């Protein structure tokens, strides 16, 4: 299969986050959807584009990309899905059907599809949610862009046996996160140490996540119930019901255009190959010289590829 290679470098980074400048362009807001309060950050004007983060992050993962998209003439909305960031952390509702319904309710509450379907972008677990949303509510989604994730139940599983050191570093958390109780026992109170290790290990340019950025991620991950809530996505997605829903969803191929890029030291070409199993119109490939945290490690390249795709 054909894969596009996008070479990334330090030139694709931006200066460290400047709150004073950022908050002149964007603002916090919340909306009640499906019985939960969802937090989001938005700004800019034009056709809306919805950004969905992954684990263990929040809307904040998009902070470098958002001004670039707004400058390109888009209304940019970065959402904290239930259980993430500053959204509510209920005891249930972390299966993909509910996550997709949350997005549909959120989009309706904000009137984002009044003028037609909107563009949706996901990273990591945000890719799971964005794909499920596009599959469950295809009339809502004009185009879907996804970054660095495998999709359990659709992405072919790794060969059985002891994984290589490289593979283990990339995938160990799938088995760990789905365990009941143990992750909470080990992680609560040690969020800073854990996140420091995670960002250092999975990033090619870990310095793009500054000490101030780490403080923000520690804040949302150390909040009461945050670890359990975020890991509930893995527990549902990797369980029998979640996998069955993935298989059923894959039988209805997406008709809207899809952009899929993995990171060279992340999932690589696996994501675009995965999306070609579930969609009929797929573009994408690999960000070379980039780690898993693509919106932070190469925000200029991420924004450029999004706008290229969504301007076609």
Please state what every model-predicted region is.
Residues 2-41, 48, 77, 84-121, ...:
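Flexible "cap/lid" subdomain of the alpha/beta-hydrolase fold that forms the substrate-access gate
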Residues 41-86:
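Conserved HGGG/HGGXW glycine-rich cap/lid loop of the alpha/beta-hydrolase fold
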């Amino acid at each position: 299969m054909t894969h596009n290679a996008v070479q990334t470098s330090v030139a694709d980074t931006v200066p460290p986050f400047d709150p004073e400048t950022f908050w002149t362009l964007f603002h916090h807001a919340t909306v009640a959807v499906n019985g939960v309060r969802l937090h989001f950050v938005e700004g800019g004007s034009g056709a809306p584009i919805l950004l969905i983060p992954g684990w263990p992050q929040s809307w904040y993962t998009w902070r470098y990309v958002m001004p670039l998209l707004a400058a390109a003439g888009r209304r940019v909305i970065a959402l904290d899905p239930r259980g993430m960031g500053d959204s509510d952390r209920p005891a249930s509702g972390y299966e993909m059907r509910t996550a997709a319904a949350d997005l549909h309710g959120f989009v309706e509450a904000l009137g984002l599809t009044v003028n037609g379907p909107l563009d949706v972008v996901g990273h990591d677990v945000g890719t799971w949610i964005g794909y499920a949303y596009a599959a469950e509510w295809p009339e809502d989604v004009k185009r879907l862009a996804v970054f660095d994730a495998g999709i359990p139940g659709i992405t072919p599983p790794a060969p059985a046996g002891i994984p290589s050191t490289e593979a283990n570093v990339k995938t160990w958390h799938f088995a760990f996160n789905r365990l009941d109780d143990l992750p909470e026992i080990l992680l609560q109170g040690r969020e800073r140490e854990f996140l420091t290790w995670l960002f250092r290990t999975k990033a090619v340019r870990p310095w793009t996540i500054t000490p101030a950025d780490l403080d923000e991620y520690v804040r949302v991950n150390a909040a009461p119930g945050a670890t359990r809530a975020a890991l509930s996505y893995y527990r549902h997605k990797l369980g029998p019901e979640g996998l069955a829903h993935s298989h059923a969803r894959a039988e209805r191929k997406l008709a809207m255009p899809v952009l899929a890029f993995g990171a060279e030291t992340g999932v690589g070409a696996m994501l675009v190959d995965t999306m070609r199993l579930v969609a009929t119109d797929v573009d994408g490939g690999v960000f070379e010289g980039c780690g898993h945290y693509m919106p932070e490690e190469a925000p200029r390249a991420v924004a450029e590829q999004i706008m290229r795709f969504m301007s076609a």
